[in-house]
């Protein structure tokens, strides 16, 4: 029969030395010297009955140090329970639990006898005589499943809530309702993605501070700018990407602060009007792009063709409106004919035609190929972004395109047409940051229902231009080249 670690004098010596000195324990057991920021988390969490809430930017090492906290709590307190909570179970496995595995490997290499008493599996960590009781567990708190968090009780209990900003108030009600013991602790960790909810309150009305000495939480901010683990090059890159320290995304993902304002309109009217008068210098290798928004649904009654000069990619993209065409009450067949007539490659060499690829836009795109042999680029901006980084920043391609277009306006890389419709639409695009920390543009249905705003057909074409690929207008294409372009576009449109 397995013996408990409490019978081993070596374990008792570790407890005597490090139960209340986790900073030293991190060094001795795991070979990790915590940064001054990580020290703050450790010093708060190692206190009996502590309630700690941490906002953090990228790269501060919070997941690594949290894994060490979880292991030490289990090691030093007989019968202890650590509950790792997140909206998705896989989120914990990919984050904190990954570090538990690597740090535990270091600990047993330094103190091999520990492996006799503590068992690590793919999804749990427990004392050999206390499986299911003296243990680290993972629980999901996805909406509708909050009651699964109930039933946790122990003399020494630690809840660790990952990405806490996205956890529902109902889940927190269940969790905090279990913290009835003298040494029941809670540690919240997250980027500060939304200015509401329990996690937000833990840094404001529930936080211990000079004006609120009876608050519940020790609130800690980990700013990536101040972390010795974050290279200055990363900070410079994020400043350039987000456009300044006060940009909401920079505040959330770098400074670890709740943004001053995250909901409102994408652009102000003065910014839009300046963009109609601005002189934008196009880069070498620019190409012609015609973006088409097809009327249909959500109160729309106009189709728009926007012919533009385009150069560069992403935050280097420059866009100059050349011609804006608007049509009322035209059929898909009529619109396809107008696109073919207006986007003449003899006048606009190598012009790329991009059409919204859903709804009636799909029919128009099909007609362009069936009647005129033209393969258009279909904009499917309801789809998700491709890279992990982009997925973390943008809810979908529509959000990416709108944010990129707005940044182009603000930084002087886009010239808009002077039409009243464009000015009105561009200055009334409702945008915000959701609980996952992603930019999200209000749906067109909600724009109409909540704000009585019509579909921004003209502005949408400028957003399409941030997604469209183009061919330099002075590039000579052979028949084989054109076939390759058509093949590539067909692949993109799948």
From Swiss-Prot:
Record carries keyword Nuclease: yes
SS bond list: none
Tagged with keyword Hydrolase: yes
Single GO molecular function: endonuclease activity
Top-level division of the source organism's lineage: Viruses
Cofactor: Mg(2+)
The enzyme's E.C. designation: 3.1.-.-
Motif (Walker A motif): 56-63
Entry binding sites for ATP: 26-33
Binding residue positions for Mg(2+) 2: 293, 356
Keyword line: ATP-binding, Endonuclease, Hydrolase, Magnesium, Metal-binding, Nuclease, Nucleotide-binding, Viral genome packaging, Viral release from host cell
Quaternary organization: Interacts with pacA protein.
Role according to the record: Component of the molecular motor that translocates genomic DNA in empty capsid during DNA packaging. Heterooligomerize with small terminase protein to be docked on capsid portal protein. Forms a ring-like structure through which genomic DNA is translocated into the capsid. May have or induce an endonuclease activity to cleave the genome concatemer after encapsidation.
Protein name in UniProt: Probable terminase, large subunit
Gene: pacB
